Swiss-Prot record:
Annotated NCBIfam families: Hfq (TIGR02383), PRK00395.1 (NF001602)
Record keywords: RNA-binding, Stress response
UniProt organism field: Chelativorans sp. (strain BNC1)
Family indicated by similarity: Belongs to the Hfq family.
Protein name (record): RNA-binding protein Hfq
Lineage: Bacteria, Pseudomonadati, Pseudomonadota, Alphaproteobacteria, Hyphomicrobiales
SUPFAM superfamilies found in the cross-reference section: Sm-like ribonucleoproteins (SSF50182)
PROSITE patterns linked: SM
Plastid in keyword set: no
């Protein structure tokens, strides 16, 4: 069965959503938001913190910085880390 192609943005957001890894989102206007991604679609990200949800439009996001490293791809057999 052919492996389904997934874009990097969706792969990243889905990984942090599943892991419930807290992250910081910086908006283009300089605002800093922190929380956990609970859902996302093509246009927005739902961020949860202290029992409250915030709907953040992707076009307003500058940077997403997870609090812990995110591994998006499995290491290939035989590969070594430097």
């Amino acid at each position: 069965m052919a492996e389904r192609s997934q874009n990097l943005q969706d792969l990243f957001l889905n990984t942090v959503r599943k892991s419930k890894n807290p992250l910081t989102i910086f908006l283009i206007n300089g605002v800093k938001l922190t929380g956990v991604v609970t859902s996302f679609d093509n246009f927005c990200v739902l961020l949860r913190r202290d029992g409250h949800s915030q709907l953040v439009y992707k076009h307003a996001i500058s940077t997403i910085m997870p609090s812990q490293p995110v591994q998006l791809f499995e290491a290939e057999e035989g590969s070594r880390e430097g």
